[in-house]
Amino acid sequence: MKHFETHRARFERAQAACATRECWSPFPDMPAKYPDSAAAQALGLATFRAHLGGALDKSFVLDQPGGAGEQGEQGEEVSPYTRQKLGIVYPQADPNTLFDAATRAIGSWSGATVDTRIGVLMEVVDRLYQGHLFEITQAVMHTTGQSFNMAYAGSGVNALDRAIETLVYAHQAQHAVAPQARWERQFGSAHIALEKTYRLVPRGVAICFSCASFPTWNAWPSMMASLATGNAVIVKPHPATVLPMAISVRVFRQVLQAAGFDPNLVTLALDSTAEPIGKLLVKHPKTAMVDFTGSVQFGQWVERNAHPALSFTETAGCNTVLLESVDDLDAVLRSLATTLCLFSAQMCTSPQNIYVPVSGVRTPDGLVSFAEVGERLAAAVATLTREPAKAALILAAVQSEQTLALLKHMQAQGAQRGEVLLAPKPYAHPEFAQARTSTPLMLRVSTAERDLYGQERFGPISFVIACNDAADALAQATRDVRDFGGLTAFVYSTDESYIDQAELAYAQAGAQLTINLTGAMPLNFAAAYSDYHVTGLNPAGNAALTHLAFVANRFCVSQSRRPARAKQETEAN
């Protein structure tokens, strides 16, 4: 309970924010606002650099079963900014060793009180923030390609907020179960009195997959959801982005051990792109739950094959934009352009498909043609990415070579089947001359090319799609979400009746809708404690951050009952 009391005020404030859905965070949203920021950033950078091996591989020491590398060491991370290997190798443990250790670790952890577990995990959050935030920021930046600011905010403090938010719901779900009850009723002339005891029983070992582009944002809350409910977690990072999760696992283990619990509640399972072990982990007989964030293909395989384990998935889909009518077209296009560029559209919430009536978009100055809308949007994107210094802040770097190959392929397809409104090209990053970069690709197509845009095209790729009219645009967009998945949606209309139709249609399709938003806030920004991320209603994922359903099925309730004893007897026991 010591840690819970230490963090009680922060936790209770988080509970209040979840109840009201208001804006709150205990963490500064910009690196410069972090306490003693210059010193903290310098220390984080130095710590990150100390991990690097350079020409000679350097072992990341992780004191876990198999930590000496019983199956050797593995590492293949390459910085998207330098295109040089990080030179870090991590111990590869036999999965059976990890499962055995995790299973043994659950006993004392699940026997602790809910508040004790929550307190220890709040201490993990605090330790990550106080001691490792800028180290992880650099690790995220040089494995995913995120900018420094995004790695700090999105993969740092906002991910920590999501972790705390998950703990709030885990606390609520478990405290909803009374630990004991006295039950009495008449059966004929007999009066029956029973003592009932209710126990929270964890499901077992959870596998947590972290993705290549945003490893911590989904993994931290998933880990918290399983651990807070008494389970153990084996983390399976993407081979391209191991370091942020290896640091995280080490911190979890240190805090757990210091609190008197078995650190093997959290371990790291490593694989390579050449020899993946994901399917083996999912189908392992000791796997009770699978948290997966990543590709649509593997996510769908997890959903189909995880049974009898439970699966919690977030993959991707076709995030849609409807342009029906606007008050200020330039403001709308600037906001869209910014969001299309943000982290080179390598986020699961990035918009991709923009549906426009073929007759054009209504504005106070009259109808703007379909062709002009596309051209002005392309021009807005080009303006944002023209200056390398500005492009570096917003586009950052491209995580993988596969994305560049996809850009080339889609550009060729677009030229054959539609029109290339904006061709991609590398830009010169002002700090990292070798950075893997690209400006966005924008294609203009008709709905006849649905096979071209009817899936996530990962990276800075967007489609301006001609629809028969506004009603057809709404029907096409929401059908694509239902069929192919979609996490976010954006509607621009001055017609309240149309907005009402769109709200209902998108709610039924299961995409989180933003209406008529312009200005400084990125359109796809999702606020912890307030915004729900994923609905579970379409193929883009079956779980949501965060509400009770994300945590409540990670534990079960068992009970025992017996004839009521005299008060002194129960007190003696």
Task: Report residues per predicted region.
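Short, flexible turn/loop "capping" segments at secondary-structure junctions
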Residues: 78-79, 313-315, 346-349, 452-458, ...
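Short, conserved secondary-structure transition motifs
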Residues: 269-280, 356, 396-406, 522-527
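Conserved C-terminal structural/oligomerization subdomain of aldehyde/semialdehyde dehydrogenase
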Residues: 1-13, 111-122, 133, 260-263, ...
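N-terminal Rossmann-like NAD(P)+-binding subdomain of aldehyde/semialdehyde dehydrogenases
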Residues: 1-191, 225
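ALDH superfamily catalytic-core signature
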Residues: 2-16, 27, 33-35, 251-260, ...
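Rossmann-like NAD(P) dinucleotide-binding subdomain of oxidoreductase/dehydrogenase enzymes
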Residues: 174-333, 337
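Residue-level signal for inorganic ion chemistry
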Residues: 83, 117, 230, 266, ...
